[in-house]
């Protein structure tokens, strides 16, 4: 029984250390100063939600619900280490430098979305109005899920 306990403790320690090293590897080179992702959803003639969501390189989240959103005001929170690594992995895989910066159709009422990515000190800005470019969909969904849809964020100042 003592041997089983020792094996379990050793296995747990190995898992903990390996997850720490994978998080460290994932975040390699990423700092709050050189990495952030912001998604801004603009107005239309109707009741389109108007908001912005930002995630910094240290996992800090800020959501600003402006109009026609479930929550108006500025909300803050933080990503878990694993969620932050998920975002960093998406950024690494997105081939950001080779994406077109604009995909705007001539539709007057279509709200403009803007994704601004600062990744390892390089700045990328993308705008679209009639459908997210395929290469950016996973990043957009991640930002929406963790800012606009994130009910665990708290109202700033509370």
Regions found by a protein language model. Give the residues of each.
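Short, well-ordered, aromatic-rich surface patches in folded extracellular/luminal domains
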Residues: 4-5, 20-45, 51, 69, ...
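N-terminal, post-signal-peptide region of Sec/Tat-exported proteins
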Residues: 54-82
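Short hydrophobic/aromatic-rich motifs at helix boundaries and adjacent loops
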Residues: 14-16, 59, 86-87
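Sec-dependent bacterial lipoprotein signal peptides
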Residues: 1-20
């Amino acid at each position: 029984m003592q041997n089983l306990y020792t094996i379990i403790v050793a296995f747990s320690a190995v898992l903990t250390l390996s997850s720490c090293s994978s998080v460290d590897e994932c975040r390699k080179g990423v700092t709050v100063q050189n990495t952030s992702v912001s998604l801004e959803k603009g107005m239309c003639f109707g009741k389109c939600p108007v908001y912005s969501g930002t995630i910094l390189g240290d996992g800090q989240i800020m959501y600003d619900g402006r109009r026609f959103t479930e929550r108006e005001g500025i909300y803050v929170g933080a990503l878990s280490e694993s969620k932050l690594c998920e975002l960093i992995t998406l950024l690494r895989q997105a081939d950001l430098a080779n994406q077109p910066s604009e995909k705007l159709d001539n539709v007057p009422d279509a709200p403009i979305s803007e994704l601004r990515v600062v990744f390892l000190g390089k700045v990328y800005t993308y705008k679209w109005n009639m459908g997210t470019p395929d290469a950016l969909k996973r990043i957009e969904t991640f930002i929406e899920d963790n800012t606009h849809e994130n009910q665990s964020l708290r109202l700033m100042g509370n």
